């Protein structure tokens, strides 16, 4: 508000660029998320910008008028761009925008100058770094969430060893992914998409239960058959907000209401968790509380790593090849 007040006398058009998304259904106004991660609708409602450019959700919004502010959001991965034009009419600017593909042609420069570097990177990505006792095929999102994921078990094992924590949680990208043997750096970076570092949080049993309840809300029973809840699919696909745990034994009962589905929680060997507090290793992304895990924000941080997970995973595979898959979780889901 202060920025708008300060600059208003000098601006014909005010534009806010925000690394955020839309927390409400832009057609109905229904609240979709209150995590604080997405606040574009609040900005449009409470601040008097002419244009609001967002880019967090990877959700296409070609152009929409919200509370007198023109808002837009391009899709992910630079496949398209938004061309926004304004026309001054009757003392104000009216906007329209079009979504335009970037096309397949490029200029000769800097392409030619950068090509040797690109070639070297591609060769490095394809160098073998180790082997698995068996390749991991691409894992269906629902099946992995219901029955467990070998890929997630591998990532959690890396996190446990690197951090020394008692428990660990990790997530996977939106697309079904596996890991072939021999393993290459390309394979690792495709399997673990994010440049996350590690954080160890001090958590209680109550916090662990809240986190697992959030995971259990991923499922929706339709005629007694588990499906993926639309809250993880709309307004954008968020499979990466379902977490896989290690060091624990837990059971979800999907017949129970969301928020009361965790009916068993113990250590991996079945013994009680104990008094606590406990050390939970997670990503720096999840530690901020994003994705519906707001309670993590209040947890004390015991340790922060500075090496990204793809590099840690490659280091682990190199040091322990051939990789035998750990059994680091007991997960049971009832429906």
Segments and roles (model prediction):
Residues 1-14, 96, 105-108:
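Binuclear metal-dependent hydrolase catalytic cores centered on His/Asp/Glu-rich metal-binding motifs
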Residues 6-51, 146:
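Active-site-proximal segments of metal-dependent phosphoesterases and phosphodiesterases across multiple
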Residues 15, 52, 56, 86, ...:
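Divalent metal-coordination and catalytic microenvironments
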Residues 17-21, 55-57, 74-76, 171-173, ...:
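Active-site-proximal beta-strand/loop segments in catalytic clefts of secreted hydrolases
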Residues 28-33, 107, 111, 141-149, ...:
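Hydrophobic alpha-helical scaffolding
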Residues 35-128, 216-220:
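Active-site-adjacent helix-turn-beta-strand microarchitecture at beta-sheet edges
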Residues 127-150:
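Glycine-rich phosphate/diphosphate-binding loops and the adjacent beta-loop-alpha structural elements
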Residues 154-157, 162-166, 171-335:
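Feature captures C-terminal
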């Amino acid at each position: 508000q202060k920025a708008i007040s300060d600059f208003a006398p000098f601006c014909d058009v005010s534009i806010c660029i925000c690394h955020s998304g839309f927390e409400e259904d832009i057609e109905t106004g229904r609240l979709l998320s209150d995590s604080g991660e997405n606040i574009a609708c609040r900005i449009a409602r409470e601040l008097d910008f002419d244009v609001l450019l967002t880019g967090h959700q990877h959700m296409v919004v070609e152009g929409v008028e919200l509370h007198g502010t023109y808002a837009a959001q391009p899709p992910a991965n630079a496949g398209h761009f938004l061309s926004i034009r304004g026309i001054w009419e009757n003392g104000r600017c009216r906007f329209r925008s079009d979504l335009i593909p970037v096309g397949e042609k490029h200029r000769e420069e800097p392409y030619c100058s950068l090509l040797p570097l690109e070639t070297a990177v591609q060769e490095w990505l394809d160098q073998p770094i180790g082997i698995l006792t068996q390749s991991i095929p691409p894992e269906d999102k629902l099946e992995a969430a219901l029955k467990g994921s070998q890929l997630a078990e591998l990532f959690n094992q890396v996190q446990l060893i690197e951090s020394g924590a008692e428990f660990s949680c990790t997530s996977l990208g939106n697309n079904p992914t596996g890991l072939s043997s021999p393993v290459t750096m390309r394979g690792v970076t495709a399997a673990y998409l994010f440049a996350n570092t590690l954080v160890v949080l001090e958590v209680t049993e109550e916090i662990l239960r809240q986190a697992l309840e959030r995971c259990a809300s991923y499922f929706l029973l339709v005629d007694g058959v588990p499906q993926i809840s639309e809250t993880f699919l709309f307004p954008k696909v968020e499979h990466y907000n379902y977490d896989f745990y290690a060091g624990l034994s837990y059971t979800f009962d999907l017949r129970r209401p969301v928020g009361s589905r965790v009916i068993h929680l113990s250590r991996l060997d079945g013994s009680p968790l104990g008094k606590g507090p406990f050390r939970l290793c997670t990503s720096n992304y999840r530690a901020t509380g994003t994705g519906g895990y707001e309670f993590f924000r209040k947890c004390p941080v015991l340790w922060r790593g500075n090496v990204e997970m793809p590099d840690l995973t490659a280091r682990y595979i190199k040091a322990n090849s051939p990789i035998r898959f750990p059994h680091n979780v007991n997960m049971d889901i009832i429906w």
